[in-house]
């Protein structure tokens, strides 16, 4: 089963992935962008180089294609539980050039069965981002991230409607433990 965690930076995805690693010890944990060696290089270029938005979108699509082919598909074949920090949903939300059609091509129509969507309010997002160093995307500001968050939600529910992906929407302001229990229950109801 392919499960993804989605949310803007600061929503608590990394915290939840850490907690899930303790609970699902046999799961394959991965991330987008950067879930492969090639992906790490593409991610570094996309986030740190001064390139056009179109070029950045294609770098992320290339990363996604390689990630699906070399990580996700083999793990699905082995019937592993796969938990990914981000997916095509982020690709579509963060870039105006990353359409569903391009992402379906990059993923060979391999989609997550379950989507965990962590949503955060403006005040908590400001507070959490003030505690970390920001990359090029995060430096675009709180309002931009809140717009991206709305797009994450829109794309997650569009995948649910078009392809039957299950969505669990959570308030990221809740305690990490409370969120973890809800996420684990959502994953375990099939595992």
UniProtKB/Swiss-Prot annotation:
<keyword id="KW-0808">Transferase</keyword>
<keyword id="KW-0545">Nucleotide biosynthesis</keyword>
<keyword id="KW-0547">Nucleotide-binding</keyword>
<comment type="similarity">
    <text>Belongs to the thymidylate kinase family.</text>
</comment>
<feature type="binding site">
    <location>
        <begin position="7"/>
        <end position="14"/>
    </location>
    <ligand>
        <name>ATP</name>
    </ligand>
</feature>
<dbReference type="GO" id="GO:0006235">
    <property type="term" value="P:dTTP biosynthetic process"/>
</dbReference>
<dbReference type="GO" id="GO:0005524">
    <property type="term" value="F:ATP binding"/>
</dbReference>
<dbReference type="GO" id="GO:0004798">
    <property type="term" value="F:dTMP kinase activity"/>
</dbReference>
<dbReference type="Pfam" id="PF02223">
    <property type="entry name" value="Thymidylate_kin"/>
</dbReference>
<keyword id="KW-0067">ATP-binding</keyword>
<dbReference type="GO" id="GO:0005829">
    <property type="term" value="C:cytosol"/>
</dbReference>
<keyword id="KW-0418">Kinase</keyword>
<dbReference type="InterPro" id="IPR018094">
    <property type="entry name" value="Thymidylate_kinase"/>
</dbReference>
<dbReference type="GO" id="GO:0006233">
    <property type="term" value="P:dTDP biosynthetic process"/>
</dbReference>
<dbReference type="InterPro" id="IPR018095">
    <property type="entry name" value="Thymidylate_kin_CS"/>
</dbReference>
<protein>
    <recommendedName>
        <fullName>Thymidylate kinase</fullName>
        <ecNumber>2.7.4.9</ecNumber>
    </recommendedName>
</protein>
<dbReference type="InterPro" id="IPR027417">
    <property type="entry name" value="P-loop_NTPase"/>
</dbReference>
<comment type="function">
    <text>Phosphorylation of dTMP to form dTDP in both de novo and salvage pathways of dTTP synthesis.</text>
</comment>
<dbReference type="GO" id="GO:0006227">
    <property type="term" value="P:dUDP biosynthetic process"/>
</dbReference>
<dbReference type="InterPro" id="IPR039430">
    <property type="entry name" value="Thymidylate_kin-like_dom"/>
</dbReference>
């Amino acid at each position: 089963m392919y499960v993804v965690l989605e949310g803007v930076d600061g929503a608590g995805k990394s915290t939840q992935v850490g907690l899930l690693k303790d609970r699902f010890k046999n799961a394959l944990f991965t991330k987008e962008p950067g879930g492969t060696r090639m992906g790490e290089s593409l991610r570094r270029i996309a986030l740190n180089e001064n390139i056009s938005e179109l070029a950045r979108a294609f770098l992320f699509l290339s990363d996604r294609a390689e990630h699906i082919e070399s990580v996700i598909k083999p793990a699905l074949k082995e019937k592993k539980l796969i938990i990914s920090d981000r997916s095509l949903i982020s690709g579509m939300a963060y870039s105006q050039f990353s359409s569903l059609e391009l992402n379906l091509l990059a993923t060979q129509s391999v989609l997550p069965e379950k989507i965990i969507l962590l949503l955060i309010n403006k005040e908590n997002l400001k507070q959490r981002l003030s505690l970390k160093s920001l990359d090029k995307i995060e430096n675009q500001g709180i309002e931009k991230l809140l717009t991206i968050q709305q797009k994450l939600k829109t794309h997650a529910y569009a995948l649910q409607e078009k392809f039957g992906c299950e969505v669990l929407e959570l308030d990221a302001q809740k305690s990490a433990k409370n969120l973890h229990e809800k996420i684990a229950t959502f994953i375990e109801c099939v595992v």
